[in-house]
Amino acid sequence: MNFSDPTLLILLGLAALGIISHNNIVTVAILVLLIIRLTPMEQYFPWVEKQGLTIGIIILTIGVMAPIASGTLSASTVLHSFLHWKSLLAIVIGVAVSWLGGRGVSLMSSQPSVVAGLLVGTVLGVALFRGVPVGPLIAAGLLSLLVGNT
């Protein structure tokens, strides 16, 4: 391992931040990336970069939808949610956040220079404030409202 490699130093620093903050999500994610980077699996980084976000969103969606699929959250409970103001507000906010995420994807594609800042900010938010790493898309969406998509 070449400790003068800036990329490795950044990853090690982020892993340390995850460990210090007791955030297993950051720690495991960074350690997996380090393993990929330091082994012959490094050849799969283009695939991980291209498909990782999609796979992550699929897994996140499975986790969110599991209570409905398992029956823990009954159909009647779901239907009754349309009658409560908090649930209706949650629906509106869900639509807004999804829209922001879409803007975020566009911004990250059209202005790749902002990606590093968004990623570092998200990792810091996860590590220091016990957030969850869904932030880059939403952060990019919010940023797109301020700076535009192009």
Curated annotation (Swiss-Prot):
The chain crosses the membrane at residues 16-36, 53-73, 82-102, 114-134. It is found in: Cell membrane. Its main location: membrane. InterPro entries: UPF0756_TM. Signal peptide: none annotated. Keywords: Cell membrane, Membrane, Transmembrane, Transmembrane helix. It comes from the Bacteria. GO terms for cellular component: plasma membrane. It is a multi-pass membrane protein. Belongs to the UPF0756 family. This is UPF0756 membrane protein SG1722. It comes from Sodalis glossinidius (strain morsitans).
